[in-house]
Amino acid sequence: SVLTDAQKHRFEENLELDFSFGLKGLSRFRANLFNQKGAVGCVFRAIPYEIKTFDALGLPPVVADLCKKPRGLILVTGPTGSGKSTTLASMIDKINIDRHDHILTIEDPIEFLHNHKNCVVNQREVLADTHSFADAVRTALRQDPD
């Protein structure tokens, strides 16, 4: 099974579940498990192990400029499947290569996996590493992210 016991329990309680998992040598996947017509349904999206560069994604130069900013809020919005997670992963990777900082993500679920390059990258998953987004955001400043 790709589900942990805790995830199985959450699915039984909530009748739906967002989660991610990886198959070695193949890919990572984001999945949404749900009930429909008395049966279980699931939708999977592939998450590549390799994070694409700005050039490969066709992102405008202004996105690279945003990654140089020492502070601020950047909103990446769009419909499902439009590339929000891929864009954010590319931005995190760019920062990870170009800077020497502490990157902290709060995700539901963790999608792209980031290795430490020039930054320390801590990825927290809601309901696995923290009880809620609110709790994670509240304690984030104590974890000294840049």
Predicted segments with their positions:
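Switch/coupling sub-region of P-loop NTPases
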Residues: 100-102, 109-146
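Conserved glycine(s) of the Walker
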Residues: 83
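N-terminal "pre-motor" subdomain/linker immediately upstream of P-loop NTPase catalytic cores
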Residues: 1-79, 87
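A conserved segment at the C-terminal end of the G1
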Residues: 86-96
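Conserved ATPase "switch" residues in P-loop NTPase domains
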Residues: 67, 96, 141
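Short, conserved catalytic or interaction motifs in soluble domains
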Residues: 56, 97, 145
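Post-Walker A helix-loop "phosphate-sensing" segment adjacent to the P-loop in P-loop NTPases
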Residues: 94-104
